Amino acid sequence: VALLLSNRPDAGALGRARALGVETLVVDRETFRDGDRVAGLLARRQIDFIALAGFLWLLPPELVHAYAGRILNIHPSLLPAYGGKGMYGDRVHRAVIEAGERESGITIHRVDEVYDNGDVVARYRLEVRPGETPESLAARIHELEYAHYPRTIEREIMKL
């Protein structure tokens, strides 16, 4: 990991990254909207691959094009179900439970110019248990994310 970029100055990952000697940057929405500027910032740091986690802003088209096929995102549902703008975190888990779904999981996908729309790289499933709450489902989904996202990122980077 060469750089951790966040839109939230209070993100816990920033402190963890700094403690490991990883450069960190916090960007505001106005700066981030300039996709050419962000792509240039990343190129100057020789960033070859982008992995998103908990980043809720739609990426500017210029950035998506500059890193076409080299941006991954993780989503806490089996896309295309429960994806799209505004569907994140507990909102997803609550919707899954309220719909009576019998399974949920995570989707790791390439990023394009539409929320949660890119080509699926991997899906991992789990059973929604009777009596499941959004909080208990979130905890189990996080376990899937921690187990599979780093390995999937590594596998995709090795293909470059």
Describe the predicted segments one by one:
Residues 1-160:
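One-carbon transfer enzymes
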